[in-house]
Amino acid sequence: MGASKIINYSEEELLIAKFAKALSHPARVAIIKLLLEKQSCICGDIVEDLPIAQSTVSQHLKELKESGLIKGNIDGASICYCVDTHVLQKANDILNKVLGASIQTQTTCC
């Protein structure tokens, strides 16, 4: 059996991986887009706007919340969700910094 290799990833690399995982499913991308379009917190309307079962939406919301991309606040018997614009901007900045620099320095490809 091979030995485990310990790799110390930078904070930037770990954040990119976390955001990429959170956005790796089209339903989660659709939820983020919906929340951004509404420009306010949504309480229970997500299931009505997307063709996804309630249990599936709940699972995707949990994943997005764990990544920090959205916030959920309890409002009576329901939870209101909205995009955490500061975290989303941070994700955007990091991706632009890393990918933008890579694209600018890339001169040839196979």
Where are the regions that the model predicts?
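N-terminal helix-turn-helix DNA-binding core of bacterial DNA-binding proteins
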Residues: 14-53, 75-87
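Short, hydrophobic-biased segments on the C-terminal half of alpha helices
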Residues: 61-62
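Short, hydrophobic secondary-structure boundary micro-motifs
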Residues: 43-44, 73, 91, 107
